[in-house]
Amino acid sequence: MADLSVDMCGIKSPNPFWLASAPPTNGGEQIMRAFDAGWGGAVWKTLGNPIVNVSSRFGGLDYGGRKIIGFNNIELITDRPLETNLKEMYEVKKRYPKHAVIASLMVETKEEWKEIIQRAEDAGADGLELNFGCPHGMCERGMGSSVGQEPKVLQEITSWVKAYAKTPVLV
């Protein structure tokens, strides 16, 4: 069988097939089932504060105001406590040390970035994804895609993260 292993920025995994940060990566049990099924890595559903649960989780896309042609997912960051996610992340890395686990992060202040980075790395995250692209969560608080659209803010937060992180940082 062919060797499909990858090394991306020092993050190793048995193959290039990874789950994105989304509802299927919202917990350790789901990620372990994915690894059992052959996935090589996972980006944990975005961790941060506060936990906000929205309803409904879908918004309709209409065509000319006449008919629905699709749906938007308006789910925000994880709706599970940070401590629970970090404990499960630790267990996933313990059970699957050769699989990639990336912590997707979204917080506001420099102090919050420093704390969540250390906690994610202590839980075994192989790398950090800075969630600067999410179009439907926390924009009103200067997070998600509002950061990704402002180069100076993006540069400032990325510099904080790089100063604190010991693992690769993905922006």
Annotated model-derived regions:
Residues 3-13, 18-23, 27-171:
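Active-site entrance/lid segments in N-terminal catalytic domains of soluble metabolic enzymes
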